[in-house]
A protein has these predicted regions:
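An anion/pyrophosphate-binding glycine-rich loop and adjacent beta-alpha core
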Residues: 22, 31-181
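C-terminal, flexible cofactor-proximal segment of oxidoreductases
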Residues: 279-281, 285, 296-314
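A glycine-rich dinucleotide-binding beta-alpha-beta segment and adjacent secondary-structure elements
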Residues: 178-181, 185-283, 287
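Short, ordered coil/turn segments that flank beta-strands lining enzyme active or ligand-binding pockets
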Residues: 70-71, 258, 265, 303
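Glycine-rich loop(s) and the adjacent beta-strand/alpha-helix scaffold that form part
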Residues: 1-48, 93, 294, 298-307
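Structural signal for hydrophobic packing residues in well-ordered secondary-structure cores
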Residues: 26-32, 111, 169-176, 190-201, ...
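Short, small/polar residue-rich loop motifs at catalytic or cofactor-binding pockets
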Residues: 60-62, 248-250, 294
Length: 314
């Protein structure tokens, strides 16, 4: 399988997070391993109010948006919103029909964006960042989309809002160098999925995932929109979101021993140098393998940092 790197990506970390520390350690004799193990996201959008150059924000999606590739084909199961980012990235970069393109698309309704769009970054979540319970309840349970999400819908260069599918697809095509999407084909795929909500025995994996997610009260209240037809004007307007590949983490890094001391190529300890956190692949040079799980990164930082601190103290 041929994997082609994207020609363009947006940046999900500050400009100073560039891996230069690892290169300095290599020049000093340290060994880096597993540099091919990268953790990037497929749901990146350009920040309309950037803090650093090429600043990207990741959408943390609920399960209901329809996901299309660059030429307008619905992504196959289990490549659904919020499921497996690395499997989706692998699909987008290895399918010969689309590997030349660096983007994909969400198509959704206003009702979906109000309930299911969350954005990465502390500045995009003032309710959580400031531990403001009143704002949290208003934002997550009130009407309309959260303020930061609505701001992206209004100002983001990757967002298209329209009342009809023809108008929507025309706007989406305007965001790419050449028109790649066919409105009739997009509409047919959305209509087919819309109809599955009327089928109590549906085998559509995405529809089943939506129903399953709503069995949990927390998701039903705050995270997953009530099943509805995207093409019903009552649920509009329609929204298209151009998704970019966004950089985030390296799962490899400087190889260390159990005391977080950096090792040389021959396996001996490089005196005076320790590595912890992402610089050490979250521990040792790559504790995760080629995949990982959200929520497991911080633990590796804390544990390897603790080991480094204890080693330095002794």
């Amino acid at each position: 399988v041929t994997i082609t790197p994207p020609a363009t990506m947006i940046t999900g970390v500050p400009e100073y997070v560039d891996g230069s520390g690892i290169e300095v350690a290599e020049r000093a004799g340290g060994r880096s391993v597993n540099r091919d193990r990268m953790w990037h996201y497929t749901e990146g959008i350009s920040n309309w109010a950037p803090i650093w150059p090429n600043h990207g924000i990741r959408i943390l999606p609920g399960p209901s948006s329809m996901w299309f590739d660059a030429i307008g084909r619905r992504l196959p199961s289990p490549l659904l919103p919020g499921f497996d980012t690395l499997a989706t990235l692998r699909h987008l970069r290895t399918d010969p029909a689309i590997a030349q393109y660096d983007h994909s698309w969400f198509v959704l309704s206003q009702r979906i964006i109000e309930k299911e769009f969350a954005l990465s970054g502390s500045e995009q979540n003032p309710d959580l960042t400031n531990r403001d319970l009143a704002l949290l309840l208003k934002t997550r349970l009130g009407s309309g989309a959260p303020g930061p999400v609505e701001a992206f819908k209004q100002h983001g260069i990757d967002f298209v809002v329209a009342e009809s599918i023809d108008e929507l697809v025309a706007g989406m095509n305007a965001l790419t160098p050449a028109p790649l999407l066919n409105a009739a084909a997009i509409e047919a795929q959305i209509r087919d999925r819309d109809l599955e909500f009327d089928n109590p025995f549906t085998k559509d994996a995405q529809v089943m995932a939506i129903h399953n997610a709503r069995r949990y009260r927390g998701d039903r209240m705050m995270r997953v929109a009530k099943p509805h037809r995207i093409l019903d004007p009552a649920n509009g307007p329609l929204i298209g979101v151009k998704l970019n590949i966004i950089t985030r983490k390296s799962l490899g890094g400087l190889q260390t021993d159990l005391q977080s001391r950096v090792l040389r190529e021959d396996g001996s300890v490089l005196p005076g140098l320790w590595a912890a956190g992402e610089a050490a692949g979250f521990g040792g040079g790559g504790v995760h393998g080629y995949n990982a799980l959200e929520g497991t990164f911080l633990g590796g930082c804390l544990f390897s940092g603790r080991a480094a601190g204890r080693s330095m103290a002794h």
